[in-house]
């Protein structure tokens, strides 16, 4: 049997290994000069005014919502078609997640669905850029501005994504992920970007004990050893070991995303050429640059003769990995029991059928051919 083809694999090379070695030899391995450089370089890459490195996108979402004052009595609009961390954070802050449906073929929220969900208690909207494609931001921004509601973009899938010629993160507030499967990785990490000076200051304080200053700042800038705690905060800072990896990855991003785009185009070509009964997501109609974080197909048993779970198992039996992005949050036990009446037709239809095929920069067209051959064999059986 052929070697296992994983669903995802980080593109780690000698440069990342050398960067980590340099940090280990430097004597400063926690938050320090690598973080500062990463934040500056991320601002340059996205055009953002402020970038604040954190230990995960989840941590970034937590301190951002806290900085906005989200709490009991508030509602936050978000898709159910997302990773549950966002719902968990909203819930843990005492607020209510208002889960809305997505477009059937984009898996992204629409301005119409958001507008229908707004109430006097709505405090924030969190649209999700999905699989590397950008949500249609202009009408959502206009809606949020008219209503005076905070807008926080979940950009965990969108490093290198652009909307109407503008990098995601250049305007407003967005949160990126450096998790192991993301287009830029440092194993675990994230970045909050914003053009709001006050929000940036609050996020920076909340992510480090409420101090607004870290150990490296105190040493290099001569501040008092015991800085003032201005508000209770968390320890969500990113270590320089991780930041060094992320810096190398960020420099490689155009090349890495170009490889992903070529592989995605080849997948689309082969699916069409072999007339396989699997529907990929539609690319957005609005001008954009796709980061191709994921390559997702929908497996409908009525068309293919096999359901999604069986398809994933059959791929596994052929030593091919796959993923599920995502099981709808409102179908998870806690949220299912908390919101038993909630029905989201397009989200549920997709949640039962979506399958993420292998896609990572070090893949080859031969690997895609192998996946396509496996899909063909599975449906023919």
From Swiss-Prot:
Its EC number is 2.6.1.87. The keyword Lipid biosynthesis applies. One of its GO terms (cellular component) is membrane. It is an enzyme of class 2 (transferase). CDD domains: AHBA_syn. Pfam families: DegT_DnrJ_EryC1. This is UDP-4-amino-4-deoxy-L-arabinose--oxoglutarate aminotransferase. The gene is arnB.
